[in-house]
Amino acid sequence: MEMRGTTILAVKDDKGTAMIGDGQVTMGQAVVMKHSAVKVRTLYNDQVIAGFAGATADAFTLFERFEKKLKTYSGNLVRSAVEMATDWRTDKFLRKLEAMIMVADAEHILIISGNGDVIEPDDGVAAIGSGGSYALSAARALMRNTDMPAADIAQKSMEIASEICVYTNDHFVLKTLEK
């Protein structure tokens, strides 16, 4: 049985980037297996933040591969993401992985999917996972209508998402990078 269910949100402003994830791991459609999973972490000497949604074991495989790409390309986030997406799309083993990752540095937020997509949002806000739509909507509203810093927008948006999405809890891990 697959273990999944999460929300990851990244928000970028003129001072830096924040990424936040909830801690809930759900088995199937009915059982919460863990409340305090850590799905957001720093990579490459704390210069990159990465978060995942989907199958946990698959996500760890993707994190390891992405960190190798960062080392190969001297921390160049965009190049590493493009190379990772190419491998993911063309490798028989990787294509079967059921996870999605979001990576960010102080300048970029990128969503990397198994279809070979590398997507950078136009507005500096991106979200993945079951509660992603709720968190994204809240973050965009706060970005447009307040002067809150990125970390505060991320926190408040995840609080809203956790009130709506049954697969998202309020045990958050928040990581930030300054420009």
From Swiss-Prot:
KW Ribonucleoprotein (keyword) present: no
Q: Please give a single GO biological process term from the UniProt record.
A: proteolysis involved in protein catabolic process
Q: Does the keyword ATP-binding apply?
A: no
Q: Where is the active site?
A: 6
Listed under GO cellular component are: HslUV protease complex; proteasome core complex
Q: What is its EC number?
A: 3.4.25.2
Report the superkingdom from the record. Answer: Bacteria
| Principal location class | cytoplasm
Q: Name one Pfam family in it.
A: Proteasome
Question: Where along the chain is Na(+) bound?
Answer: 162, 165, 168
Q: What does this protein do?
A: Protease subunit of a proteasome-like degradation complex believed to be a general protein degrading machinery.
> Oligomeric state and partners?
A double ring-shaped homohexamer of HslV is capped on each side by a ring-shaped HslU homohexamer. The assembly of the HslU/HslV complex is dependent on binding of ATP.
Q: What is this protein called?
A: ATP-dependent protease subunit HslV
